[in-house]
């Protein structure tokens, strides 16, 4: 088991968790925590959204996951988990691909009792270029079986399943999925960067169609062409408008995760969010 540079007990940290820093999650792959970022997250009082990918699942054992979980939970940090997604297809018409996808998701679900996360974020996985036409219903039926299993498994541990947009062109490609999952506790994770880079519908249309079902936000910016994961304000997204519209639909804030991909971009994200936070 890899040694971590942080004690498991006590509250630790170099700053008091106040303001916006205590209201948001910050994304971080589990492998990065094990390779040095754990100490920074503890020192800065950050609430993590921990990415669980194939590398983490294959490299580390239960003891590694349990120890990292204890370090955060003993310090009163809230945790969210992001399930594996690369090369996975939760609605695949290929039985072997579907089986492998469900196996990887099940491996992530097994970690829920360790981390006690608020949410488990999964990619909904629809792409009209691959699953359009007659394959749409096959994709939907397989997806529903996949997500009902996951939602049922995690609900007893107090975690909420949230499904995130990636290549979906507009909310119309997700509405029937959420309609059919009504009653499972499954909610929508609106990813602002993805709707800008890959979608065709503006943010206000997403919020109008699915705003009441939003349980989580992924906030990052881009210039409208690539999934750059820039600091908020460094791209084309109008975050004051997006959050303002959401606040008119949601009386209390959803879970909010910041997803910059450079360490230097975190503080600018926090500063902007502090200025425009509408709740």
Predicted regions and their residues:
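Short, flexible loop segments at the rims of nucleotide/cofactor-binding pockets, characterized by
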Residues: 25-28, 98, 164-166, 194-197, ...
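Active-site beta-loop-alpha junctions enriched in small/polar residues
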Residues: 27-31, 51-55, 84-86, 125-127, ...
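Acidic (Asp/Glu)-rich catalytic clusters
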Residues: 37-45, 62-80, 110-116, 152-156, ...
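Charged helix-capping and loop-helix junction motifs
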Residues: 62-67, 98, 102-105, 136-144, ...
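Active-site acidic/histidine proton-transfer and metal-coordination neighborhood
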Residues: 7, 91-187
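Hydrophobic faces of well-ordered beta-strands that scaffold small-molecule active sites
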Residues: 22-28, 48-50, 79-81, 120-122, ...
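N-terminal pre-domain/capping segments
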Residues: 1-107, 279
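Histidine-acidic metal/acid-base catalytic patches
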Residues: 2-21, 36-39, 91, 171-187, ...
